[in-house]
């Protein structure tokens, strides 16, 4: 995802938040 390219380190946290928000 775009986040991965922007912050591959934060992807884990951002991804979880995005999935939870969904």
Swiss-Prot record:
It is found in: Secreted; Secreted, Cell wall. PROSITE patterns: PEROXIDASE_4. GO terms for cellular component: extracellular region. Its EC number is 1.11.1.7. GO terms for biological process: hydrogen peroxide catabolic process; response to oxidative stress. It catalyses: 2 a phenolic donor + H2O2 = 2 a phenolic radical donor + 2 H2O. Binds 1 heme b (iron(II)-protoporphyrin IX) group per subunit. Binds 2 calcium ions per subunit. One of its GO terms (molecular function) is lactoperoxidase activity. Gene3D superfamilies: 1.10.520.10. Its cofactor is heme b; Ca(2+). Keywords: Calcium, Cell wall, Heme, Hydrogen peroxide, Iron, Metal-binding, Oxidoreductase, Peroxidase, Secreted. It is an enzyme of class 1 (oxidoreductase). Belongs to the peroxidase family. Classical plant (class III) peroxidase subfamily. Removal of H(2)O(2), oxidation of toxic reductants, biosynthesis and degradation of lignin, suberization, auxin catabolism, response to environmental stresses such as wounding, pathogen attack and oxidative stress. These functions might be dependent on each isozyme/isoform in each plant tissue. This is Peroxidase 5.
């Amino acid at each position: 995802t775009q986040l991965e390219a922007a912050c591959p380190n934060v992807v884990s946290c951002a991804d979880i938040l995005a999935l939870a928000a969904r």
